[in-house]
């Protein structure tokens, strides 16, 4: 079941409104959409969101780590977010339109999965470039490689720019071709 995603301040009303529906609540955290708030505040926001009832946490990576090639810093950051999220699913938003190259997208995808991401997501939906097919292909192939090496199935979410059913069908077809029907 897909979750309803809200800002941290809206978790309590969302949990209350959805309490008997079986629909989980997700929260955008870590200074969404820029991800530039101080590290300790980003970690605290994740912890507070989980405590308030969020079952999924969407985090925004620090793009500066990818752009500077500091993959260890990105790993450590996402690993800390994973620990703060506890039992909640962790979705890492790569903001691919701001990563500069497909190579950075591939590396950021792999680093986030290695650090414990349950999903990797293209965009916040606020960037000037959101989900694209080339970026999605790179991310899906990273997921496939990670699965082949670890046996762990990581989810994928395209975000931003998908406004029609036919847009979604293109991405569903790509996912099915690259990963197979179990990812649908």
What are these regions (language model features)?
Residues 1-3, 9-156, 163-184:
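Alpha/beta enzyme core
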């Amino acid at each position: 079941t897909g979750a309803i995603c809200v800002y941290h301040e809206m978790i309590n009303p969302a949990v209350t409104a959805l309490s008997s529906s079986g629909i989980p609540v997700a929260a955008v955290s870590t200074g969404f959409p820029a991800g530039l708030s101080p590290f300790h505040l980003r970690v605290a926001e994740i912890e507070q969101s989980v405590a308030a009832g969020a079952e999924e946490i969407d985090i925004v990576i620090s793009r500066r780590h990818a752009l500077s090639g500091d993959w260890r810093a990105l790993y450590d950051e996402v690993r800390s977010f994973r620990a703060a999220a506890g039992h909640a699913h962790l979705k890492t938003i790569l903001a691919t339109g701001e990563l500069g190259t497909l190579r950075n997208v591939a590396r950021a995808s792999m680093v986030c999965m290695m650090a414990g991401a349950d999903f990797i997501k293209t965009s916040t939906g606020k960037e000037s470039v959101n989900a694209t097919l080339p970026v999605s292909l790179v991310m899906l192939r990273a997921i496939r490689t990670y699965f082949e090496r670890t046996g762990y199935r990581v989810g994928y979410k395209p975000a931003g720019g998908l406004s029609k059913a036919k847009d979604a069908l293109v991405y569903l077809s790509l996912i099915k071709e690259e990963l197979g029907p179990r990812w649908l």
